[in-house]
């Protein structure tokens, strides 16, 4: 049962990340098909989904014990069809306002919010010894949605797929592209994911609890410490994923970045899974500490690769260092998430037993607080997806 729920969750979460980061590919191509948005506006479109995704992760982190994992996964996956359909029609009309694109980009953020409920739900299915690995697989393979989207979308827009309304657009260079396909290609898969979640997942009775029972987790000091640590790792990963293509386009305009953009998120997503598994063996604290040192090193090196006075910079060095940042931000995302699961489970068990509670109550409270903490901390981490592209 646990494995089946995990793999359906991975599929739905992967699709959520595909929708969440749609504008990292779409924004790069908007001005090619007749729009006249400024660079700042395009960066804003890539960043806005992270704002709504982060804010929505707060309520999403509490919904699983209230509605059940099966029901919520099906609902939260199904509603992502709305921004995909809308975006597909919007990009075909060059008169579509920037405000409309802002609204659609905010709706895409619902895909990012799914992470909080998905991770919280999976935490109920696995014991402490396997939580790091399970959460790493769910989060890491779910994060693959970013690289899957950045790989598939450029291919999808290069040819007509949906004959019923696929008129395509002519770029400023005279080429034809079908930008709507970047959004519409996910609709059938979202429908499949919705049905798979509804008929294949489970609502655990042990996972049921009210919002009032979950809110005390916000009073735990460890929650805010771990939120900052997670912001530095996952916030970096999602921020880099959102802004990497646009940053490369501004710094190295001769490079066709969409041929390479998916590599970074792909490396980071796989590294996240590895980070959780490694942390189960060596301890999340040790892995996270070493990882932070490496992240700082790569961040410092990045500045040396950019164009500046008297030199054109080096795209090869820029790309290599950025891949190092994707790798370490992915590893750190997995290791910090493993720390959250271990810390809150341990603290809650000790607190309940100190208050005289029995083992059954302690286990139930530990699962509830761990789930709520995982979701809320993920909300803080997602804010990096807004701030990092804005700094570019």
What are these regions (language model features)?
Residues 44-62, 262-275:
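Central cavity-lining transmembrane alpha-helices of secondary-active solute carriers
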Residues 23-28, 220-269, 273, 333, ...:
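Extracytoplasmic gate region of multi-pass secondary transporters
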Residues 97-113, 313-333:
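Hydrophobic core of transmembrane alpha-helices in multi-pass small-molecule transporters
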Residues 158, 162, 185-207:
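C-terminal membrane-cytosol helix-exit motif in multi-pass small-molecule transporters
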Residues 55-98:
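Conserved MFS/SLC helix-loop-helix module at the cytosolic interface between two early adjacent transmembrane helices
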């Amino acid at each position: 049962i646990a494995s089946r729920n995990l793999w359906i969750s991975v599929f739905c979460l992967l699709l959520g990340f595909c929708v969440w980061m749609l504008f990292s590919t779409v924004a790069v191509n908007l001005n090619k098909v007749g729009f006249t948005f400024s660079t700042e506006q395009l960066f804003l479109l890539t960043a806005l989904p992270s704002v709504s995704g982060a804010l929505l992760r707060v309520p999403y982190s509490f919904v699983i014990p209230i509605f059940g994992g099966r029901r919520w996964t099906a609902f939260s996956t199904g509603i992502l069809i709305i921004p995909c359909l809308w975006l597909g029609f919007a990009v075909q009309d060059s008169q579509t306002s920037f405000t409309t694109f802002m609204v659609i980009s905010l709706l895409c953020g619902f895909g990012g919010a799914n992470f909080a409920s998905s991770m919280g739900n999976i935490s109920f299915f696995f014991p402490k010894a396997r939580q790091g690995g399970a959460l790493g697989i769910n989060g890491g393979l779910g994060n693959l949605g970013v690289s899957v989207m950045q790989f598939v979308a450029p291919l999808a827009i290069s040819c007509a797929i949906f004959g019923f309304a696929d008129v395509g657009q002519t770029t400023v260079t005279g080429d034809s592209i079908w930008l709507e396909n970047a959004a519409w290609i996910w609709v059938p898969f979202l429908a499949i994911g919705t049905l798979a979640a509804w008929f294949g997942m489970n609502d655990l009775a042990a996972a049921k609890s009210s919002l009032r029972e979950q809110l005390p987790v916000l009073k735990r000091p460890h929650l805010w410490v771990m939120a900052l640590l997670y912001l530095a790792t996952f916030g970096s990963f999602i921020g880099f994923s959102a802004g990497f293509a646009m940053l490369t386009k501004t710094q190295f305009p001769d490079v066709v970045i969409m041929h390479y953009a998916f590599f970074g998120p792909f490396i980071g997503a796989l590294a996240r899974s590895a980070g959780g598994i490694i942390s189960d063996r060596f301890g999340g604290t040790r892995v996270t500490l070493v990882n932070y040192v490496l992240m700082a090193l790569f961040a410092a090196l990045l500045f040396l690769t950019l164009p500046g006075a008297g030199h054109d910079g080096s795209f090869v060095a820029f790309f290599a260092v950025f891949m190092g940042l994707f790798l370490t931000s992915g590893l750190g995302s997995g290791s910090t998430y493993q720390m959250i699961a271990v810390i809150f489970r341990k603290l809650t068990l000790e607190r309940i037993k100190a208050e005289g509670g029995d083992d059954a109550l302690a286990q139930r409270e530990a699962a509830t607080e761990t789930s709520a903490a995982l979701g809320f901390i993920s909300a803080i981490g997602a804010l990096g997806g807004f701030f990092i592209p804005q700094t570019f």
